[in-house]
Structures are given as structure tokens and as C-alpha cells.
């Protein structure tokens, strides 16, 4: 019997994602001026306020207020009626120095033997049901909101859009785990109050709300969806769109109050959106605001890199990779593989795990170097998912009143590169 599977995404203007982006913007600026920075930056955003807290060890000085305001303005919180606006919100910092005990436990004379920054288990997942080796439900949920943000920034249609939004996509699968069709799409988007009631009566207000909701629903189906579909070039995925899709658009009705004014946002509260949308597994550690000595982040990226390259090489159609660490110890405690019975090689999952251990150095410093993680590459990861993104080289310029400006060429989403496929094929005789 087939089944339904659902994943959700949230926009860059969702309060938790605002917090993630501020935390990663702080991390990026510190890494730009001091690549050896140790950073754990947490952010809280609420009505008219930003609170930064955490632990940092660095030689760099950065303007935290300016960083936070630039991120908020870039996202689109630029109007006072949002009750959270980049130029006027308060920014409070309680960031202090990293624990000397943790630092002693992690650093080593030989950098390659640098210990893990904490204990824990991290997971990487990949499936061949999409071209970027991501679960289809999450991939589509991200695409919906990325296109919605493009429409908002263009300002030509759907001009009532505000930054906060969520999406959810449900896919029907057959008995063999293959996508059959898209079952349900949910889009909730914050908006201006763009229909004025005829008078102050409750009935007039209700009628105005119904007009707004009808317009938003129409625009999602007639403007947003065609643009999303036009950006999909995989014929198998395009065939899943059908006239039976159930659309829920702003199902609670009016959504004017939103963003950090509607809900307080915190760093690290969207870890399933950040990863695989509920497929695979998650070790529980968030990513944003953490430098790569924190294996919560770096080892999760490494595990994704492994899983994606293994699936792309044809070892399996689907793969989950787990690694775990003890704080202060460089080598992982274990490597675990689950191919869900979809392996294409005559090896057990345990034997596949042993080959992974031979192919990939999973010491934290080796991961940092292989994936070029000591660079300011993180703000881009903090919205629309850390996984399944397109690797690319960009040039960034960082200015500071405390340091000379720095222009750096950096590579984004290195863990998404298919640079180990040939080595894996050779190792597995494929």
C-alpha cells in the first residue's frame, strides 16, 4: 500500500530564520577577519528587539548592531508597521568569551588531531528521487518560498506580500517508495491589510478579510505556482503536478501580524527545515552561529557530502550516514550506514560503512580543510536549507571600523559537490 509523506519549509522572514541569519552573519564577519575564530552565537528576535548571546574566542572586532540591522533590512523588515524594523529595533549583546575548559579540551599541538568541540551524533542523507539528491517534498517546499521571496522583492505583482511565510508539501508514494503525485500544498504568507472595510462593522471587516484571502489564494495558484513549475526541468517531477492537488492558502485567514512581532524567533529551532524535512534522521544539534570546530555543524555537512556522493556513484538509491564523536577526541566513535534495502552493491551496510571510513577522513580538522569551512560561507545557508543547494564561488567584501576591508573569494555549499564519485566507484568496483 502506498503512503503520504510531508515536509515543510519557512521563509527567510520567519522569526526563527531571522535569528539564524543574524547568528550566521556574525559568524561570517568574525571568520572573515579571523579565520581561527571559535564562535557560538545565539540570537533572539521579538517585537522591536534583538538579543545576541553566546561564547566567542577571536582576535577580530565587529559591530554587532550593524550586522544585525543589515540582515534585518536585507530580509525586508524595513517598515515601522511590521513592529520589527532594521533601523529602529533595539540590539542587545551578551556575548562573552569561550570557556577555557572547552578550549583546552579541543585544541592540540598538531591541528589535524584537534578534538571534536562536543559529543553527539550527526546524520547525512541522500536520495535519488531529485536531481539534487534531496527528498522531493522538502525540495518543493523550499522552491515555493524562494520563488515567493523573488516575487516580493520584484514588487510587480502580489505587492501586498510581507517577509514571513511558511510552506508544506505532501507527496503520495507507491509501494516501492517512488513518488506518484503531489497530494497537498500549503502556503501561508504574511501580507498587508490591502482591502479596506466599507465601515467599522464586524460584517464589513469579515467581508474585507474574505476578499483578501480570495485574492491571495488566486495569486498563489495563478502567479506563484506557474513560476515554481517553470523553474523545474525534471520531466518526472513535472508529471507529479496534477489537477487534484489540494491547496490550503492562509488557512487560518488573515495573516497581517507576523515576523518577530507575531512570534519570538530563536536560533536553531528549524533543524528539520535545515536538513531533510523529516526524512533520514537528525542528531538534534543546530547549525547556525557555530564555527566548524562544532561537529554539530561540520560533521553533519560531511555526512551529507558522503551520502550524496555515495548515492550519485550508484552505491545505493537512498542512504543515511551517521557519525558520532566524544568531546576532545578527533576520530569519530562510529560510522553507521542504512541503505533502506536499496543498495546496489553486494555488501552489507556495515561493510559499506567500513569502506566510507577508508575513503573519508572524518577528524574535525580534516573536514574543515576538505570542505573549506574556515571561510565566511554561512549566512547563505541560514535560509531555504543547508542541504541540496548549488555549490558556487562568490566574492565577498567585508568592511569594519576596526580592521582593513577584506575581499575574499569563497566557495559556498562545498558539501554538495560531487567530487568523490569517481573515487567511490573505483572503491566499490562500479
Swiss-Prot record:
Cofactor names: Mg(2+); K(+)
Catalytic activity: L-methionine + ATP + H2O = S-adenosyl-L-methionine + phosphate + diphosphate
GO cellular component: cytoplasm
Co-factor remark: Binds 2 divalent ions per subunit.
Residue numbers binding Mg(2+): 16
Binding site for L-methionine: 55, 98, 263, 294
EC number: 2.5.1.6
Enzyme class: transferase
Family listed: Belongs to the AdoMet synthase family.
Known partners and oligomeric status: Homotetramer; dimer of dimers.
Pathway note: Amino-acid biosynthesis; S-adenosyl-L-methionine biosynthesis; S-adenosyl-L-methionine from L-methionine: step 1/1
SUPFAM superfamilies linked to this entry: S-adenosylmethionine synthetase
GO molecular function, one term: magnesium ion binding
Functional description taken from the UniProt entry: Catalyzes the formation of S-adenosylmethionine (AdoMet) from methionine and ATP. The overall synthetic reaction is composed of two sequential steps, AdoMet formation and the subsequent tripolyphosphate hydrolysis which occurs prior to release of AdoMet from the enzyme.
A Gene Ontology biological process term: S-adenosylmethionine biosynthetic process
InterPro entries, per the entry: ADOMET_SYNTHASE_CS, S-AdoMet_synt_C, S-AdoMet_synt_central, S-AdoMet_synt_N, S-AdoMet_synthetase, S-AdoMet_synthetase_sfam
Localization: Cytoplasm
Residues annotated for K(+) binding in this entry: 42
Keywords from the named record: ATP-binding, Cytoplasm, Magnesium, Metal-binding, Nucleotide-binding, One-carbon metabolism, Potassium, Transferase
Protein name as annotated: S-adenosylmethionine synthase
